[in-house]
Structures are given as C-alpha cells and as structure tokens.
Amino acid sequence: MEKETKELEAVQLPENAFRELKEGEEYEPVMSPSKVYPEVNSWSVIWGILMAVLFSAAAAYLGLKVGQVFEAAIPIAIIAVGASTAAKRRNALGENVIIQSIGACSGAVVAGAIFTLPAIYILQAKYPEMTTSFIKIFLASALGGVLGILFLIPFRKYFVSDMHGKYPFPEATATTQVLVSGAKGGDQAKPLLLSGLVGGLYDFIVASFGWWNENFTSRVVGWGVDLADKAKLVFKVNTGAAVLGLGYIVGLKYALYICFGSLAVWWLIVPGMSLLFYDQILNQWDPSITQTVGAMSPEMIFRSYARSIGIGGIAMAGIIGIIRSWGIIRDAVGLAARELKGKGGSMDEVKRTQRDISFKIIAVGSIIVLLLTFIFFLTGVMHGNLLFAVVGILLVTVIAFLFTTVAANAIAIVGSNPVSGMTLMTLILASVVMVFVGLKGYAGMLAALIMGGVVCTALSMAGSFITDLKIGYWLGTTPRKQESWKFLGTLVSAATVGGVMMLLNETYGFASGSLAAPQANAMAAVIDPLMNGVGAPWILYGIGALLAIILTLCKVPALAFALGMFIPLELNVPLVVGGAINWWVTSRSKDAEVNKQRGERGTLIASGFIAGGALMGVVSALLKFAGLEIWLSDMGLSVPATWWTNPLSEVCSLIAYIFLILFFVRVTRK
C-alpha cells in the first residue's frame, strides 16, 4: 500500500500523452491497466452528486441571467482534489475522476435545458395556451442526457484512443493537469496553483468588481466608433484569463482556422451586407426586425443575419463529418450487432482501461429510453396523436445519433460545443416536418421545443462526456465505471435544472427582461414564424452550407471555420493570442528539450488560467445568486456599471491583458 502511495505521489503524465503515437507505440496511462484502483465508492458518489446539484444550480442561474454556461469539469476537479487532500485519502486519483465525471453532468444538462425550454415560457406571454410543468422539463432533460451517453459510448474508442494526439481536447487537458498536479502534491503543483490564483483573481475582479472592461474594442478611439457606425467594421478581443489559457491549449493552427472564420463574418459579410442592403429591412423570416440593415450596429447584423451563415456552415460541416465518419458509425453499429448475437470478445480479454458497458446493455437501454421518450411525446406533448409522436421520435433519434459525432468532434477541437447552432437547425427541421404532417401553431411550437430540448441535451451531454472519457483514458480509469455512474449525475442535474428554471420563472419571469436567456429567445424568435408559415433564413443557411463544402474541398477544417463564424469575434481573437504564446514559448530556444519543457509548463499555466477563471465564475454566480452585488458596491469594491461605457475601461482592460500575457510568457520561461 505504501509503495502504491509513493507511486501516486510521483504521478506524471507520460511523455506521449499529447502527441501522436509512433507506429507500434502504445499509450500507458498514469494508473496501470494491470492494477485495480479505488474509483467508485460512497465517497466519490456522494461528492459527485453534491457537485452535480451545486453546479447545476449555479450554471442554470448564470446561463439564464447572462446566457453564459461555464464548464464545470475544471472547478469540480479542483474541489475533488482539495477534498481528498483534506481527508488524507490515499490513491484518490480514480475517485476524483468519478467525482468530476458525475458532477460535470451539470454543465451538459444545463446547456441542453436552458438553450431551448425557457422559450416555452417566453412564448407563453404571446400564446397563453402553451403550458409546461416540472415533469416535462425534467423528462426532456433527463431522457436527452441519457440518450447522449448511450449514443456516445460506441464512439469512445475512436475519439479517445484511435485519434490519440490528433485532437487538442483543451478542457480535458486542463482538467487532467489539475487532477495530476493534485495527486503529485508539493512543488510540482506550484505552477498550476500560481496561475490558478492569478487567473482566478483576474477574472473575478472583472466579473464581480468590474474594475476594467471584459473586452477591448476598436471603439476605444473616435475613428473606431465612426468605422463601426459607418463601415460596420469592428475589432474586439475578450481580455479574460480563462479564454487566453484555452487558446494556448487549442494551439495556433486550430485557433487561426477559427479566427479566420470569425474575421470572414465580421470583416467581410457584416460590412458587405450593410453595403448591399443599406436601406432595406430584411425581416422575411423574423418580423421583429424593424430596422434597415444600414441602421443596425455590426453586432446586430451579426446576430440577425451573419450568424445564420455560421449555423448553415456548422450543419453542413456536421453532415460532411457524418459522411466521413460513416465507417466509424458503421463499425460501432456492427460491433454492437455482433455482441447482441453473442459473437463479441469476452470482457475478461479486454484491458481494464478499455472496458465499456456491454453493447447488449447499450442496445437494450437505447430501445427502452427511446420507448420512454415516445410515450412521453405521445401522452405529454402530442396529446395522443400517434402520427405526430412517431414522426417526433424518428426525428429525435436520427438527429441525436448522427450529430453525436459532430458534438464530440467540436469539443475535441476547441473545447466548445456548437450545440445551440445544431439545436437551432433541429428546431427548424422539426418545425418544417411537423407543419408538413399537420401540427402547427402553439401546439406545434411546444412539441418542437420539447423535441429540441431532448436533442439539445443529448448533443450537449455527448460533447461533455467525451471530455470525461478522455480524462479517464489519460489517467487510466475504467470507462465502464465512468459510463455507469454518468446516468445518476444526469438524473440529479435534470431535476435540479428543472427546479431552478421554474423558480426563476416564478421570481423574475422570462418575459420580463430580467433573465436574458439569449439562446432561448433566439429559439423562440425562429420557431414562432416557422410554425405560423413565415419561414426561415434558408438563403443564409445555404450560403454557410456552400462555404463549408468549398472549405472541405480546399482541405480547410470546415467545422473549425464554421465555429468561428458562429461564436462572437471577441471570444475567437484571444484563441489566436493564446495560440501565438504557445508557438512563441515552444520555438524560441535552439534546444528542442528546453522548448518541450517550456511547452509543458505553459500547458500547466494555461490550465491554471482556465481552472481559476472557471472556479471564480462559479463564485461570481453564487455572489449574484445571493444578491451580494449591492453589498460589494456599498463596500466600495465594485464600480458602477456605467464605467464600462467609458473608453478608459477598455484602455485599463488592454493594460491588464498585456501584463497577464507578460506574466504567462515569463513564468513559462523560468
């Protein structure tokens, strides 16, 4: 036992953890596949459930209030490490992975639920006949989450093992570094702790005190304001520590692809639309638009039109991804079929670190969950109409299964799931099909939103879960245990999210404007005209789809480019800054070994920035939830919100950002 403890105290990720394997080379995880380690026990399960409840509540509140859902994996990993250290638990690495895996259901379920289901409450103001309940919200989230897990498991080996070193997995990398540094203890965890403290404090000052702006824009100077107003050209960069760290881990190559997509939208399409349609009101698919294109701000043109091109690009990139992944999908289904016939290999022959839930259980489980979803649609959503329920379950099954690989792929590349874009496409497709079979009006809206909620949660869960499985692969946990206990976390998170959503609706009301819920408002804006025969921006979707095909033919990663077109500019530019730091610190020395060590140290610093920023995001959310913003203001710690409208707040932001970058570079070169 003492020997094992010493081994874990000196744990270190193998040299080949993040690079592609050479021919014949195998990856040996931190925890040996030939040994058994503590993973699932009362400690890890209770802590996992507690994390799922706490982070679901915090993420739901923050997501509905400002539209941002933080990823919970990293802060949960930090808490798990802290709790096991305080309790002096030995060999806690496997337990901490399980705590993180159960708890991380929170972010996935929250994203799935709040992107779609609040649209029911938003549309209720216009259509009082639309009603929902806790049980509907819970079932849509829970069934979608469980489907996401079941549909992803057959692709685990491909994404985490077969593609080893080919994808950056930024969030999984950061979380793994947190868990490993916690297991190491002592001096080896110092870079992570230092950067976590700096990054956390930096982002907390912005989020809670507002001492400087979170973005630096070209509007900081007079000519920049004129350029934005007249030419619709604007430059924006988020100066947060967490996004900078994310850029470092993504790397310069993928960051550039993403940023080029963003610049194509913001510097070509947005100004181009203003020039071409300056005095026209383009509201064929959204009657709420009353301004001419020329009267809009660049941000409004992006939200109203250009972003739809990104959605079309993501959808087509997803379809291309499905076509390219068809062999993997076919092999996964074939393997499941062989197991069902009893021709699969014995579980005892498979390494501990490669054991998944039996495909027989996955197949039977999928059928049961789909049957339950069908019954839910038939009795709770479609009011007993068999045709509508059958069409609904077919749409949900096909879209959720096929787009599972797209969600996992996006997380593997940028750590960001374009789930809202894919869900918007699902809603549009569902609305068109349901109207075609005769379900329209408010009843059709409710049905499409519930269906969208199931799909959205399934895709969100698939993207989140591939992160957990990659962490487990690097560290050497048993996949079957992660997969089995993920279901519990999903149910707990779904119940918590349903409760918080109803509580916030009763307290503030989604139609009041107190809750931003931007994604749900976007869904409501799209679905209302569709269900009433107005239509969708098919031309814009088509342009995005065509662009994705051209990019693919030119060997440019279409999904990364389309993600850049969909995600706001200010969140894409810092990825390039972080990627450039990565390139700089790993190429300055003539000694390859020095460059390698600096790169690894940089990964620790970046992980600390992400971890600190994410953890402080939770703290800020809890302060807002408790209403302590007024107390901070009374204490003189926070500045008035009007300060952010002052250009000087952006100047302060740029100065702080430069100091943060200099700190990053300096610490990596020690």
Model regions: which residues?
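Alpha-helical multipass membrane-protein architecture
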Residues: M1-K670
